[in-house]
A protein has these predicted regions:
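Helix N-cap at the start of a conserved alpha-helix in ABC-type nucleotide-binding domains
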Residues: 148-150
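Q-loop/switch helix immediately C-terminal to the Walker
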Residues: 72, 79-98
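Hydrophobic anchor residue at the start of the ABC signature
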Residues: 126
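Helix-to-loop junction immediately C-terminal to a conserved catalytic motif
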Residues: 44-45
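Conserved ABC transporter NBD signature motif
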Residues: 49-61, 69
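Conserved ABC ATPase signature
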Residues: 112-116, 120
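Catalytic Walker B motif of ABC-type/P-loop ATPase nucleotide-binding domains
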Residues: 137-141
Length: 198
C-alpha cells in the first residue's frame, strides 16, 4: 500500500485524482505554469480547501490534528518565508551536517536573514524542512534559482534523507533532466487533471 494515497482528491480547480506514492519514492510533478501544481501541494499539506481524502500509511488525514499532519506531510513553498531576522530562530534544532552538505557555512545559524543571498535562503529552507523530520516532503521547485553545483547538493541531501528515513518525496520541477534523474514515477497536470505518465 502506498505511503501517500489520494482518493478522489484535489483542490477546487483540479479534477479529483486517485494516485499514490510509496515509501522511499520520489515522484516528480510537472505541468504548464498556472496548471495547479502549487494548489495540489498546498491541498496535500491541508493548507487550502480540497475534496476527497489524502491517506498517510493507511490513515486518513482526518485522523490527524492539523499541526500533526502538516509536520508529517510538510510543504516547502517556492518562496520561503522568514518571520525572525536570525536564522537560528527558524530551526527546532540546527543540523551542522545538513548545512555542510548543502554547502552552507557553519556560522550561518547566527547570521541575520537579511544578509542571506536568495540561494542561501533556498538551501536553508530545505534544511529547515528536514529539521522537522517529515514523512512526506512536498517540494515546490526547491532548486529553481540554484546553480548546478548547489542543485546537485540539494538533490543529494533530499535523496539521502529520503533513503535514511524511508520518506516519500513529491518534487515539482520544470527541468526534464532533473525529473529523469530524480523521479521513480512522474505525475503531470494537464487540462485540470493530474495523471501518472511514463
Amino acid at each position: 500500500m502506498a505511503r501517500l494515497r489520494l482518493e478522489d482528491f484535489g483542490p477546487e480547480l483540479l479534477s479529483p485524482c486517485n494516485l499514490g506514492a510509496d515509501t522511499g519514492e520520489t515522484v516528480t510533478l510537472t505541468g504548464p505554469s498556472g496548471s495547479g501544481k502549487t494548489l495540489l501541494l498546498r491541498a496535500l499539506a491541508d493548507l487550502d480547501p480540497h475534496r476527497g481524502v489524502a491517506w498517510l500509511n493507511d490513515r486518513p488525514a482526518t485522523d490527524f490534528a492539523a499541526p500533526d499532519w502538516r509536520r508529517r506531510v510538510c510543504y516547502l513553498p517556492a518562496e520561503s518565508h522568514w518571520w525572525s531576522d536570525r536564522v537560528r530562530d527558524h530551526f527546532p534544532h540546527v543540523d551542522d551536517a545538513t548545512l555542510s552538505a548543502l554547502g552552507l557555512p557553519g556560522e550561518i545559524p547566527d547570521w541575520a536573514v537579511s544578509r542571506l543571498s536568495s540561494g542561501e535562503r533556498q538551501r536553508l529552507a530545505v534544511a529547515r524542512l528536514l529539521s522537522v523530520q517529515p514523512e512526506v516532503l512536498l517540494l515546490d521547485e526547491p532548486t529553481a534559482n540554484l546553480d548546478p553545483a548547489n542543485t546537485e547538493r540539494v538533490e543529494r541531501v533530499v535523496a539521502d534523507y529520503r533513503d535514511r528515513n524511508a520518506a516519500t518525496v513529491l518534487w515539482v520541477s520544470h527541468d526534464a533532466d532533473q525529473r529523469e534523474r530524480l523521479g521513480h514515477r512522474h505525475w503531470l497536470i494537464r487540462d485540470g487533471r493530474v495523471e501518472e505518465t511514463a
